């Protein structure tokens, strides 16, 4: 019997959704950073086994929006819960169930798919706190299963995969065996550059940046020539991104090039231009140009 279905991964910002997706896939497709709200789009990845096919939707963290980009991220995450076959609800060990988690629980009550509660980052907590957290969440919702894991350390993730297969419905193979994502290469390129910017910039700047791939061409020798605009909201941020003698921008470019060459399996030449677009996160037309389509 072949099983298949769509699986959405939800949770507050920075609970490890992208890390878990990347671990299960064995490919770096979702942007990973220690800063919250790094995933902005629902990234669809495909995992095919001998008797199953899982289509993962890695969502932005659900949080109280402060601008139109935030509204897009929250709408995108809550919409992904609808019409799926299985939901993974990720959280971390805690002393009490917070407002963000309670909000997600309320969204879950409006759908019929089974929900597996996944308690991530248990390697960073005591067994007592892990047990207490599982007990707290068991009182909030009738979960199909509850499982503690560490996505970073790959602890108990094999058991999680078994549970996911268990709750998938019988179904067809939606995608070819060798297809691992439905997103375009240009999108992944932009996400890689944005990840490197996040890791090399201060707390004030990162979430005010976006990446627009202006050009992506492969020459006769197979080398990619890529040009991107790194968009920020303030002139002062532009100076921070470039850095003294251009050192910060050079570091973003060199680390991005290394990751891009691994992803594209080819040599890469990348040029990054820093541009100021004031209050772009509240500019609906510009947001749509940058790929955030679900704005009302």
Swiss-Prot record:
It comes from the Bacteria. It is a peripheral membrane protein. Residues 149-151 are annotated as: G5. Transmembrane segments: none annotated. GO terms for biological process: ribosomal small subunit assembly. GO terms for molecular function: GTP binding; GTPase activity; ribosomal small subunit binding; small ribosomal subunit rRNA binding. InterPro entries: G_ERA_dom (IPR030388), GTP-bd (IPR006073), GTPase_Era-like (IPR005662), KH_dom-like_a/b (IPR015946), KH_dom_type_2 (IPR004044), KH_sf_prok-type (IPR009019), P-loop_NTPase (IPR027417), Small_GTP-bd (IPR005225). Keywords: Cell membrane, Cytoplasm, GTP-binding, Membrane, Nucleotide-binding, Ribosome biogenesis, RNA-binding, rRNA-binding. Residues 201-278 form the KH type-2 domain. Residues 3-170 form the Era-type G domain. GTP binds at residues 11-18, 58-62, 120-123. Residues 37-41 are annotated as: G2. One of its GO terms (cellular component) is cytosol. Residues 58-61 are annotated as: G3. Its main location: cytoplasm. Residues 11-18 are annotated as: G1. It is found in: Cytoplasm; Cell membrane. Residues 120-123 are annotated as: G4. An essential GTPase that binds both GDP and GTP, with rapid nucleotide exchange. Plays a role in 16S rRNA processing and 30S ribosomal subunit biogenesis and possibly also in cell cycle regulation and energy metabolism. Belongs to the TRAFAC class TrmE-Era-EngA-EngB-Septin-like GTPase superfamily. Era GTPase family. Monomer. This is GTPase Era. It comes from Clostridium perfringens (strain 13 / Type A).
